[in-house]
Amino acid sequence: MLLTAAVSAVAISSVSAETLRWARAGDSLTLDPHAQNEGPTHTLAHQIYEPLIIRDMSGQFQAALATDWAPSPDDPNVWVFNLREGVTYHDGAAFTAEDVVFSIGRAQSENSNMKELLNSIVEVRAVDDLTVEMVTDGPNPILPSNLTNLFMMDSGWAEANGVVQVQDVEGGETTFAATNANGTGAYKLVSREPDVRTVLTQNENYWGIGQFPLEVTEIIYTPIQNAATRVAALLSGEVDFIQDVPVQDLDRVANTDGLIVKTAPQNRVIFFGMNMGAADIANDNVDGANPLADVRVRRAMNMAINRDAIQQVVMRGQSQPAGMIAPPFVNGWTAEMD
């Protein structure tokens, strides 16, 4: 297994610029905040919508739309969330506990790709405008973690625009929420052309102004799938910031005047999966047998993999050999098993 690094590159001139032209390999699949549980989709959504809880750069929990949260002292199956006062959506509507009740219920519905994260929640109650109780089917210490990508949606906006139900992505449905947005986040949606360009502008009424370094007033997000084209766009000045820099291009980008490469450990582990549970492997040339069911075969394959060579040659140093599927900054990691 390999723990990978997240790699990005930014033009020095963009640090003080009012507009940030940002590119990465893939576009958001939808703007519906509960339709897809997927990386690029969440990355864009986090600019527009907000969850109750976020993580800081070290992976620790940080208050967002909830200022504090804890199990009730009277019942460990009831979590109490106190909400941030004075928060408004981009259209000016107030954020309240009713929006939390609505958003959790919406995210638990059939078409939602987020529902598995909320399986333990059996009831959500608005105690008052700024207090919510979530009732679980048993003690659930990882509930805060499951809520860090669960975005809050304005129930009134959803009702007014016919998007109370989550977009049916698998069925090919297109809804108002798939191409429009009304969140509480730092940036507001200006325009959206899927797979072409998305333009955001800073939310002048954002509650987090002064707490977060909002250094640009406009974001122009352009998906560029081809890696070489993406790097060329950065080198030519067409964009200011790219994610997913190919490891083979890191030195060239880093040695270009005016560009900076940033790397950080990524919450991602690449591993070689083995089908050890099947009686027979369908695509091999041995009928009626599964050699991977034999632990000795699996151990032999484990010893045969040259992790250091993969790290140095394939990943160009942008990875770390791992002994378990959880990276060090994820709860559950232990040095003894890694």
Please give the residue ranges for each predicted region.
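Bacterial N-terminal signal peptides
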Residues: L3-A11
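A structural "hinge/loop" feature
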Residues: D27-H42, L65-T67, L143-S155, T184, ...
